């Protein structure tokens, strides 16, 4: 046994016990005194004499005191565990906030990487478009002058006009395609509406037939009900007649029995009793038959009424369905009207589009004739394209390499996103663990409150017991068995080990999250370095594209000069022809004019031909950019067309 002893001052008559501590100062000095004090004897108003001491009550008090002591120990341990859990929670919350911040930073960096990747892709696409638009011409050009800038501006305006015309054509084609699609959709809707209307009309006819059949069945059921009621009334009348006859027979038999009793012949009485029993049996059988007939009649009436109610419900449902079908037919008619209106509008738009398409076909035929003339001239310029093709191939290979690098960056960004998601999942797991720890802390708090309440109740009980006893001084001993002491110590060790295990698990999770975040940061740094390399590569590609644009502009300036020379030559030739014609007309005499007048027609025809040639050359000037773009299908890369008389440089 384990004993704890202490002493109390003689001046303290009533002990003051603090909550959470055990008062070791006892009012007795020996075990016998304790047994005498804490026995069954208690002071009462009726019997001031002490009762015989009970040793069980003293043992109960000792057990309660030991339980109080152990509860206080457990309370202290729980408080320590609570403090540890709160510290762990605060650490985990701070680590959670830090990890959330890191995740947000990582997401921002990923977004920046994606934006830079998109910008790099856009830059590469722009470079490709510039390369595709670039025309061949590997020529050393002199310093730009005012004339060249004007020529380039005029060429740009012509190209813009051509592009606007192409855009208008594309818009018209798109509109025509959309109108055709709407027309087909409208026609399909009309056909579907017709089919639906046919189906609904067939359904309406079927429903009408069903309604007529139901009405006939309802009338038949009504007739059957009336007949059944008549038969029921007849059966009831017959049963009443039979009952009256049975009652009359019973009365007659009763009278006969009374008369026979008066006569009192024993043998005859026995016979009458036998007859009475037989009549009673027959009456019982008849009553049973009556009851069965009534039950069958009631069942038949109930069945007929149920069938009537079901027929009425079906009739009401059919009426409602007929109304809904009529509403559907009306709505379908309205939709048909709307579809017809839309169909008429679509036909009007189609007529307008067909007229516009006819005009466009005429323009296309003219442009095709001009294209055929230009194709014959463009065959001369293929030799000058080879050098430019080499440079363009190099630039395209570089752009493809940049694209591949961009795709690699995309894949890396996707991997980083996956890693970020895994980090998010790890954070969520840690949050779950934290929540579990918080729940455990709350449970510990609840246990603490329960233990405090128990301690308060036990302390109140002990105070009451102490106040009831006398103020004798003595020694107090708290006894515990070895098994209880060992079990309590084992519990304390188990609780300590569990707390340490939980703390270690939380720390391991936090370290794993930190390691994953460090890995993601390293990968982000590597991706940023690769993005910088990509930016440098794209800048080089843009520089090369700018060089190609400069070469293109130089080629276009020289083409413009050659065209202006040809135009000047054509205008000079036209003016010479006109001057010669006027001189011939002035030199001829008046009598010869009558005979030579019909010969002036070919001169006028020549003048008209020269004018048309000049006009055709002027018309060919704005159409050159369109010709260059259209010729890309025949030649691998675009080439500038040359007018007759021009030489490839």
Curated annotation (Swiss-Prot):
Residues 468-482 have a biased composition (Low complexity). Residues 443-453 have a biased composition (Basic and acidic residues). InterPro entries: Web. Keywords: Coiled coil. One of its GO terms (biological process) is cellular response to mechanical stimulus. GO terms for cellular component: plastid. Residues 443-483, 583-611 are annotated as: Disordered. Residues 456-467 have a biased composition (Polar residues). It comes from the Eukaryota. It holds the Pfam family WEMBL. Residues 59-227, 267-356, 391-461, 505-549 form a coiled coil. Belongs to the WEB family. This is WEB family protein At5g55860. It comes from Arabidopsis thaliana.
């Amino acid at each position: 046994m384990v004993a704890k002893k202490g002493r109390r001052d003689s001046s303290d008559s009533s002990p003051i016990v603090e909550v959470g501590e055990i008062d070791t100062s006892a009012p007795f000095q020996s075990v016998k005194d304790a047994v005498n004090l804490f026995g069954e004897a208690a002071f009462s108003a009726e019997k001031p004499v002490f009762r015989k001491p009970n040793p069980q009550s003293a043992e109960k008090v000792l057990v309660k005191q030991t339980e109080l002591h152990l509860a206080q120990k457990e309370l202290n341990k729980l408080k320590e565990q609570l403090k540890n859990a709160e510290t762990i929670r605060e650490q985990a919350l701070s680590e959670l906030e830090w990890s959330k911040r890191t995740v947000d930073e990582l997401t921002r960096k990923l977004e920046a990487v994606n934006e830079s990747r998109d910008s790099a892709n856009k830059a590469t696409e722009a470079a490709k478009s510039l390369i595709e638009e670039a025309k061949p011409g590997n020529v050393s050009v002199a310093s730009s002058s005012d004339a060249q800038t004007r020529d380039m501006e005029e060429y740009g305006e012509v190209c813009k006009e051509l592009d606007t015309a192409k855009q208008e054509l594309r818009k018209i084609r798109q509109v025509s395609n959309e109108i055709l699609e709407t027309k087909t959709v409208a026609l399909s809707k009309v056909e579907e509406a017709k089919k639906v209307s046919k189906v609904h009309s067939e359904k309406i006819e079927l429903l009408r037939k069903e309604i007529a059949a139901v009405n006939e069945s309802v009338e038949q059921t009504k007739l059957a009900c009336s007949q059944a009621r008549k038969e029921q009334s007849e059966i009831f009348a017959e049963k009443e007649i039979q009952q009256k006859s049975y009652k009359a027979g019973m009365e007659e038999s009763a009278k006969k029995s009374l008369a026979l009793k008066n006569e009192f012949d024993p043998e005859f009485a026995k016979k009458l009793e036998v007859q009475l029993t037989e009549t009673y049996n027959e009456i019982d059988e008849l009553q049973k038959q009556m009851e069965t007939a009534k039950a069958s009649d009631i069942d038949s009436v109930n069945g007929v009424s149920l069938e009537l109610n079901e027929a009425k419900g079906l009739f009401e449902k059919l009426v409602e369905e007929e109304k809904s079908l009529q509403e559907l037919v009306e709505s379908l008619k309205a939709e048909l009207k709307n579809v017809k209106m839309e169909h008429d509008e679509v036909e009007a738009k189609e007529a307008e589009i067909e007229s516009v398409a006819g005009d466009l076909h005429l323009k296309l035929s003219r442009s095709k004739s001009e294209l055929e003339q230009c194709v014959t001239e463009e065959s001369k310029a293929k030799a000058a394209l080879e050098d430019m093709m080499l440079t363009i191939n190099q630039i395209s290979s570089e752009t493809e390499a940049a694209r591949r690098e961009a795709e690699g960056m995309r894949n890396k960004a996707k991997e980083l996103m996956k890693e970020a998601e895994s980090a998010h999942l790890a954070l969520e797991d840690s949050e779950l663990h934290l929540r579990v720890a918080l729940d455990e802390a709350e449970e510990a708090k609840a246990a603490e409150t329960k233990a405090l309440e128990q301690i308060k109740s036990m302390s109140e009980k002990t105070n009451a017991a102490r106040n009831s006893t006398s103020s004798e001084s003595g020694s107090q001993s708290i006894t515990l068995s070895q098994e209880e002491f060992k079990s309590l110590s084992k519990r304390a060790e188990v609780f300590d080990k569990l707390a340490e295990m939980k703390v270690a698990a939380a720390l391991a999770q936090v370290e794993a999250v930190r390691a994953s975040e460090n890995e993601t940061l390293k990968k982000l740094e590597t991706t940023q370095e690769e993005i910088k390399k990509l930016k440098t590569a794209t800048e080089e590609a843009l520089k090369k594209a700018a060089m190609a644009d400069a070469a293109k502009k130089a080629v276009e300036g020289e083409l413009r000069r050659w065209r202006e020379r040809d135009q000047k030559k054509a205008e000079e030739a036209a003016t010479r022809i006109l001057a010669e014609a006027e001189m011939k007309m002035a030199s001829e005499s008046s009598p010869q004019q009558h005979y030579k007048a019909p010969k002036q027609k070919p001169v006028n025809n020549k003048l008209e031909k020269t004018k048309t040639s000049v006009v055709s050359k002027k018309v060919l000037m704005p159409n050159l950019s369109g010709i260059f773009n259209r010729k890309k299908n025949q030649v691998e890369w675009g080439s500038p067309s040359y007018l007759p008389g021009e030489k490839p440089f």
